[in-house]
From Swiss-Prot:
Domain of life: Eukaryota
Mitochondrial matrix side: 41-62, 137-165, 236-253
Entry protein name: Mitochondrial phosphate carrier protein
PROSITE patterns in UniProt: SOLCAR
Main location: mitochondrion
GO MF assignments: phosphate transmembrane transporter activity
Mitochondrial intermembrane side: 1-19, 84-115, 187-214, 275-311
Gene Ontology BP terms: mitochondrial phosphate ion transmembrane transport; phosphate ion transmembrane transport
Functional note: Transport of phosphate groups from the cytosol to the mitochondrial matrix.
Locations listed in the record: Mitochondrion inner membrane
InterPro entries: Mit_carrier (IPR002067), Mitochondrial_sb/sol_carrier (IPR018108), Mt_carrier_dom_sf (IPR023395), SLC25A3/Pic2/Mir1-like (IPR044677)
Gene: MIR1
Keyword terms of this UniProt record: Acetylation, Membrane, Mitochondrion, Mitochondrion inner membrane, Phosphoprotein, Repeat, Transmembrane, Transmembrane helix, Transport
Cellular component aspect of the GO annotation: mitochondrial inner membrane; mitochondrial intermembrane space; mitochondrion
Amino acid sequence: MSVSAAPAIPQYSVSDYMKFALAGAIGCGSTHSSMVPIDVVKTRIQLEPTVYNKGMVGSFKQIIAGEGAGALLTGFGPTLLGYSIQGAFKFGGYEVFKKFFIDNLGYDTASRYKNSVYMGSAAMAEFLADIALCPLEATRIRLVSQPQFANGLVGGFSRILKEEGIGSFYSGFTPILFKQIPYNIAKFLVFERASEFYYGFAGPKEKLSSTSTTLLNLLSGLTAGLAAAIVSQPADTLLSKVNKTKKAPGQSTVGLLAQLAKQLGFFGSFAGLPTRLVMVGTLTSLQFGIYGSLKSTLGCPPTIEIGGGGH
């Protein structure tokens, strides 16, 4: 569709952005915490592929047999809290930055370069989200990889802080950025374009039922999740390794990353991909489904849709 007269751009209040953030927090927090058992298996496969080498189902059985079913909920606390905070920044921030770019570029220019608007908005929102997420993600990975390390979120967080200092929470910040920023760019870019594609067949959004809209959000989210999982898988594996490995004296984070990347190799960096495709595809689909439904429930104004083919 060619760019036509610019539609009226909604003006959001602080309250509106808070509603976007709340919807994102609930969507991300609930979905990530519900996937904790799968994430425990994925992380174990990444960290100890020679031990957990029987695939997803076999590794589930192996963990339950060796440690009990409760081991599959390891890291639930930091996952729920961390990803709720991240979701608030991720979705709320995306709306903030998309509005910022449209206001400053003008609607016509934003329409011509909408892929860049989507990508820039997603990247900036994710950077802020990762600052908040990093300490809790480091704690989660430590609890999953070392089940005897501490008893829950508070114990794990306190022990890391006491024994290794606050800087250790951000030892994985660089790989988190390498993982999450490409992931979030792919997630929102593919979701936006997939939505355009699917709505092109289904018809105008305003003429569809709420059930149809939710189903299209779920389908677009699934498409986005599969793409995002593949793009970010090598950095996800590297992140798991970084949070388990202590740096040698004088070794920089970049040096440790290079060392671990060399050890993993190309195929090793994709360890656990099938499991992660299931997990990320499912949770991304649910996130966008929940986010869309909650925006309606909370009385959020409509998000800005950018027309045109875009670059």
